[in-house]
A protein has these predicted regions:
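FAD-binding core/adjacent interface of flavoenzyme oxidoreductases
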Residues: 1-11, 78-163
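Rossmann-like NAD(P)H-binding beta-loop-alpha module
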Residues: 141-195
Length: 222
């Protein structure tokens, strides 16, 4: 099945794959143009405000507070939910995972990035990434389940140490939020909460390496 959204009006068909910050910024600017029709494709029907994922991961914010429906916010953009399985640049078509084909005149790929493991054995299998709502949900479940299991004697006290790799803004924010969560659970887990710790690892000489050194010093002290 071939879908050509702009065929009847003669408009240029611009397809954007990825509804992250980059894809949505393009869609917002292009939709103001009367000379093109914009189609936005993403596997999720919502815009994710990823800088606040750490708050979802530590039960500080509900998921709905950082996920905004794309169809509601961008009514002038044709939204297609799904995943692209193939791109034919000669025919200028995209094939979706459900078998449907979408034609385009111009294609913008804004699919984002994946967490880097740097080829370190065991990273993918034994750590949590934090790139999506599902990742944040998994972290939250694991944290709360670990507290319960240590309290019940199923897991040893050593499992209360949360290790965060990466001393950039996300790592620092997550470390602070986990520390706050550990303080908040003291009433429910008064016997084990004092044993809970957070370890933040950074390969470079200081935290927040992209920030001013004074910010790094302040962060490290606090």
């Amino acid at each position: 099945m071939l879908i050509e959204f702009g065929e009847q009006s003669g408009e240029k068909q611009v397809v954007i794959v990825g509804a992250g910050f980059g894809g949505l910024a393009c869609a917002k600017k292009l939709r103001k143009s009367r000379s093109c029709r914009v189609t936005l494709i993403d596997r999720n029907p919502y815009q994710l405000f990823s800088p606040l994922l750490y708050q979802v991961a530590t039960a500080s914010l509900p998921e709905d507070d950082i996920a905004f429906p794309i169809r509601t916010a961008y009514r002038e953009v044709q939204f297609v939910r799904g995943e692209v399985s193939n791109i034919d640049t000669t025919a200028k078509t995209l094939t979706m995972s459900n078998g449907k084909t979408i034609s385009y005149d111009d294609l913008i790929l804004a699919v984002g990035s994946e967490g880097a493991t740097y080829g370190i054995p065991g990273v993918s299998e034994n750590t949590f990434q934090m790139k999506s709502v599902h990742d944040a949900r998994d972290i939250r479940r694991s944290l709360l389940r670990t507290y319960e299991d240590v309290e019940d004697g199923i897991l040893p006290l050593e499992r209360l140490n949360v290790v965060i790799v990466g001393g950039g803004p996300t790592g620092v924010e997550l470390a602070g939020a986990v520390s706050e969560l550990q303080r908040e659970i003291q009433r429910e887990f008064e016997h084990i909460a004092p044993k809970a710790t957070v370890t933040l690892l950074e390969a470079g000489p200081r935290l927040l390496p992209s920030f001013h050194p004074n910010s790094s010093k302040y962060t490290q002290k606090n």
